[in-house]
């Protein structure tokens, strides 16, 4: 979906691009909607490809989508989106499969390339959601919770939101205690759903049937 005012950046660039048409042809189709003259289209296309990080845009113009890597195809879809006057940018999992540094680079790129457009990010990545102004939590197609990203992700009301945050392997939304200054505190205290004030002061030792544990829980 590449309209004049609304553009969509898909999760998979290869599925979005037409394998039977060159990248030049697909960019030219979008430029025609924007009103770019035929004599200016090659220059305009190279400019957009350069903006998304291609050092040899002329080579990319001659290629087809099946000749591109996944990352290259994704950048071409962003270049296509640039051939618009987007007021709304919809990005479906724009950081899927990327490491943390690449995620930040992608989000920064979208912000710099579309400074005046509203951005709707569809994501399962909490770090991406945290970079947004507002979040909407969906489950089974239903809205369960919405609000500012900082409030929803730090103090969720709905059990589903709480479960999502609690399921994070890195548990990045919680602070890791400083064990040098919090002597005697259970190291899991800040992240444990069963924690009480007692856990801040003691770690009772228990044993049974050859097993040992340091917790008040049976």
Locations of regions flagged by a protein language model:
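Conserved ABC ATPase "signature" region
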Residues: 40-59
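Conserved ABC ATPase signature
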Residues: 63-68, 72
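ABC ATPase NBD coupling module
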Residues: 1-7, 25, 33, 151-156
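P-loop NTP-binding/switch modules centered on Walker-like glycine-rich loops
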Residues: 94-172
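Charged, flexible cofactor/metal-binding loops and thiol motifs
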Residues: 147-218
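A short, proline-enriched helix->beta-strand linker immediately N-terminal to the Walker B motif
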Residues: 83-87, 116
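Q-loop/switch helix immediately C-terminal to the Walker
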Residues: 12, 19-33
């Amino acid at each position: 979906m590449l309209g004049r005012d609304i553009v969509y950046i898909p999760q998979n660039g290869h599925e979005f691009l037409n394998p039977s048409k060159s990248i030049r042809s697909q960019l030219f189709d979008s430029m025609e909607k924007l009103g770019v003259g035929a004599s200016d289209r090659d220059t305009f296309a190279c400019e957009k490809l350069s903006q998304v990080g291609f050092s040899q845009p002329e080579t990319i113009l001659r290629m087809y989508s099946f000749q591109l890597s996944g990352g290259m195809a994704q950048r071409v879809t962003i270049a296509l989106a640039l051939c618009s006057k987007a007021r709304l940018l919809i990005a479906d999992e724009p950081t899927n499969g990327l490491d943390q540094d690449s995620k930040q680079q992608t989000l920064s790129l979208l912000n710099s390339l579309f400074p005046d457009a509203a951005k709707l990010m569809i994501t399962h990545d909490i770090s991406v959601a945290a970079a947004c102004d507002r979040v909407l939590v969906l489950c089974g197609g239903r809205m369960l919770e919405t609000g500012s990203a900082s409030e929803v992700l730090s103090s969720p009301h709905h059990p589903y939101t709480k479960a999502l945050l609690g399921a994070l392997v890195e548990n990045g939304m919680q602070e890791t205690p400083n064990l040098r200054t919090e002597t005697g505190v259970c190291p899991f205290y800040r992240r444990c759903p069963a924690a009480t004030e007692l856990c801040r002061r003691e770690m009772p030792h228990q044993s049974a049937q050859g097993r040992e544990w340091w917790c008040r829980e049976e």
